[in-house]
């Protein structure tokens, strides 16, 4: 089955088991955040494009529909619009920001250029709580991002709230179960935002809160057994949480029909290869084949400094190594399926969901050779990262694996700016291990999304160590906070923790005489340096 068919079948399977809330994506990054907030309320959600025909949306039998925000103005030629038929289908609908304005326009309300744009924190006054805003304080701080405003609600709708720049900041038609808000309840900066969403999901739409780690595990085990039957499966373990949880799910479903392959490319952090070989096997009982190919990867990377070339070489060598192992295993007993740890954001961002725009390619979604003769098993393809961690804990995986910070597939190779050598890898491993140890001791390891440690091996910085002048390389600390890695802010690490990290690194690594802190958000910078 083609990957698109796999995801379509898996999504349809979820729709049969749970109430589904469709999040209609109007082109901003808010759709994923809305979908995650719905799932935090224990309700299953899916993202669909704004140009999906209403009949196709209704074919999914949604319990509710949410129209997301977006960057367009309803007055711009070619701006996304909403088919009015959606509001006559009897399905509860919540419009947010642009979705609120498009909803108002489609139903005969008025959207105007008021000249009073609102961006960021804004004071909102609730004028009539209604059903949507019941039990919400009279005045709250909300997150706004709009230039146009609804100036008149559609006929039959009650106006619920206003701000200085939005005379109609929320409305509802209780009888038709149609509601909307100008602000972003899904953003953490909005006070009572999750409460507003849950009023819509439970009080207005009547959704069932049955989406949780236990139900996900049960659903996926049934799905995997139905797909695999009595045939054999192979899984490539990277040392990361995604592949570990995917493998553990398949192991729980089909037992010794699964063989895991760990390609040790020598580019992992300190202790991670041993963690895969020992802790994962002990927790799952999985059959593990280890291919130690560190020298092969170092030889292939010799003399290479361009980051994109590094990525391509590592990807090529990984696939070749994995294929070699798979062929040997397949010769003993045929293997039909390959497990991948693809996540739902990978699918959405790669345009592999339901027609979404292709933002970027992902190594889990594309990149496999055309002649790769396995059918894909992707048990995490409907899940966000926080759900993957919850499933990992439900399956009994060690916390060190479940809470492992995101780590790039090419490993430390793209955290060395310059040529990758055995000596540079050892220096970076030591600096990274010290950083992780001190962050953990300070209780920051789960508060920080990730903390890349980067070696600027081609930069030489003058220093004084002992009684002499040195020319060493700087180490960069890149701690960031994020929810999904699409955007990130630099993490405010206490100075005393930074001091300990810097002192320990420069003492342990004579090649390093300077430790610097990257305080750039994403955008404009990416999280990784290469």
UniProtKB/Swiss-Prot annotation:
GO terms for cellular component: cytosol. The active site is at residues 97, 184, 186. ATP binds at residues 238-244. Coiled coil: none annotated. Residues 211-404 form the GMPS ATP-PPase domain. Its EC number is 6.3.5.2. InterPro entries: Class_I_gatase-like (IPR029062), GATASE (IPR017926), GMP_synth_C (IPR001674), GMP_synth_GATase (IPR004739), GMP_synthase (IPR022955), GMPS_ATP_PPase_dom (IPR025777), NAD/GMP_synthase (IPR022310), Rossmann-like_a/b/a_fold (IPR014729). Keywords: ATP-binding, Glutamine amidotransferase, GMP biosynthesis, Ligase, Nucleotide-binding, Purine biosynthesis. It catalyses: XMP + L-glutamine + ATP + H2O = GMP + L-glutamate + AMP + diphosphate + 2 H(+). Residues 20-210 form the Glutamine amidotransferase type-1 domain. It comes from the Bacteria. SUPFAM superfamilies: Adenine nucleotide alpha hydrolases-like (SSF52402), Class I glutamine amidotransferase-like (SSF52317), GMP synthetase C-terminal dimerisation domain (SSF54810). Gene3D superfamilies: 3.30.300.10, 3.40.50.880, HUPs. It is an enzyme of class 6 (ligase). One of its GO terms (molecular function) is GMP synthase activity. Pathway: Purine metabolism; GMP biosynthesis; GMP from XMP (L-Gln route): step 1/1. Catalyzes the synthesis of GMP from XMP. Homodimer. NCBIfam families: guaA_Cterm, guaA_Nterm, PRK00074.1. This is GMP synthase [glutamine-hydrolyzing]. It comes from Cutibacterium acnes (strain DSM 16379 / KPA171202) (Propionibacterium acnes).
């Amino acid at each position: 089955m083609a990957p698109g068919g796999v995801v379509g079948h898996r999504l349809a399977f979820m729709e049969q088991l749970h109430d589904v809330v469709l999040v209609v994506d109007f082109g901003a990054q808010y759709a994923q955040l809305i979908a995650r907030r719905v799932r935090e309320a224990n309700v299953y959600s899916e993202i669909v494009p704004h140009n999906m025909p209403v009949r196709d949306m209704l074919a999914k039998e949604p319990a509710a529909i949410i129209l997301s925000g977006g960057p367009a103005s309803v007055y711009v030629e070619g701006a996304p619009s909403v088919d009015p038929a959606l509001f006559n289908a009897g399905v509860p609908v919540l419009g947010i920001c642009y979705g609120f304005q498009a909803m108002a326009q489609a139903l005969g309300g008025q959207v105007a250029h008021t000249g009073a744009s609102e961006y960021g924190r804004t004071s909102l006054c609730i004028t009539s709580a209604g059903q949507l805003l019941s039990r919400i304080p009279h005045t709250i701080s909300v997150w706004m991002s709009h230039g146009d405003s609804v100036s008149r609600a559609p006929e039959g709708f009650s106006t619920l709230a206003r701000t200085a720049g939005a005379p109609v900041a929320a409305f509802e038609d209780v009888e038709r179960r149609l509601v909307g808000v100008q602000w972003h309840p899904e953003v953490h900066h909005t006070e009572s935002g999750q409460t507003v969403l849950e009023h819509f999901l439970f009080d207005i739409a009547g959704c069932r809160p049955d989406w949780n780690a236990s139900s996900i595990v049960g659903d996926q085990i049934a799905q995997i057994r139905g797909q695999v039957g009595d045939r054999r499966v192979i899984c490539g373990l990277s040392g990361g949480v995604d592949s570990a949880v995917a493998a553990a799910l398949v192991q729980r479903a089909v037992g010794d029909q699964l063989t895991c392959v760990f390609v040790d490319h020598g580019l992992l952090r300190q202790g991670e290869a041993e963690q895969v070989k020992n802790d994962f096997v002990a927790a799952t009982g999985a059959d593990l084949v280890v291919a130690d190919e560190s020298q092969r990867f170092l030889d292939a990377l010799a003399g290479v400094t361009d980051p994109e070339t590094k990525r391509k070489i590592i990807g090529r060598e990984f696939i070749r190594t994995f294929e070699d192992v798979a062929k040997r295993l397949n010769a003993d007993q045929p293997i039909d399926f390959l497990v991948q740890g693809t996540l739902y954001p990978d699918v959405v961002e790669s345009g592999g969901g339901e027609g979404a725009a292709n933002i970027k390619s992902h190594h889990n979604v594309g990149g496999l050779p055309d002649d790769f003769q396995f059918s894909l098993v992707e048990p995490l393809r409907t899940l966000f990262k926080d759900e993957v961690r919850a499933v990992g804990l439900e399956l009994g995986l060690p916390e060190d694996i479940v809470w492992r910070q995101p780590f790039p597939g090419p490993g430390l190779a793209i955290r060395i700016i310059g040529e990758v050598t055995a000596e540079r890898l050892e220096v970076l491993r030591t600096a990274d291990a010290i950083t992780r140890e001190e962050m953990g001791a300070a209780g920051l390891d789960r508060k920080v999304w990730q903390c890349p440690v980067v070696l600027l091996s081609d930069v030489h910085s003058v220093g004084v160590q002992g009684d002499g002048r040195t020319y060493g390389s700087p180490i960069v600390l890149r701690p960031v906070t994020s929810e999904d890695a699409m955007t990130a802010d630099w993490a405010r690490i206490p100075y005393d923790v930074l001091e300990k990290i810097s002192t320990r690194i420069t003492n342990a690594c004579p090649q390093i005489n300077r430790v610097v802190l990257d305080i750039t958000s994403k955008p404009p910078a990416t999280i990784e340096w290469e």
